[in-house]
Amino acid sequence: MKRITMFLTAAALVLAVSAPAVLASGGGGTRIALRSAQAFPAAKGAATFKAKPGERELEAEVEHVRRLAGKTVTFYVAGQKLGSAKVGALGAAHIARRNGAVPAVRAGTVVSVKTAGGVLIVKGSF
C-alpha cells in the first residue's frame, strides 16, 4: 500500500513540475472566439495568438459568411489593419501573420473582421 502511495505521489510531482514547462514553451497559445455582428448573425470566427521569446504569431479566421464568397474581408487587431483575405466558396477566410507583422497583443486587445465597405462581421477580445 505504501509503494502505491509513494508511486502516485511521485507521479503527481512529476506532472506538476512538467506542466508549467510545457505551457512556458508556447503550448497552444491563447485562442478566442470571434462573435457575430448584427449584420452577419450566422458568422463565427476564432483568433489564436502565440508568443515565444523573439517570435509572435497571430492567426484569425471567419466562417459562415457564404454570401461574401469571392469578396475580400479585412482583419484588424487593436484597431490596426493586420491584412486582408478573400472569402472562399464555402464562406470562410483565414489569415496568419508572424513577428513584425503582428502588433502587441495583451488582455483586452480586440480582433475584428470587416467587409471592404467597413461593415463588422465578427469581433472578440483576448
Give residue spans per PLM region.
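N-terminal targeting/export leaders
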Residues: 2-7, 14-15, 19-126
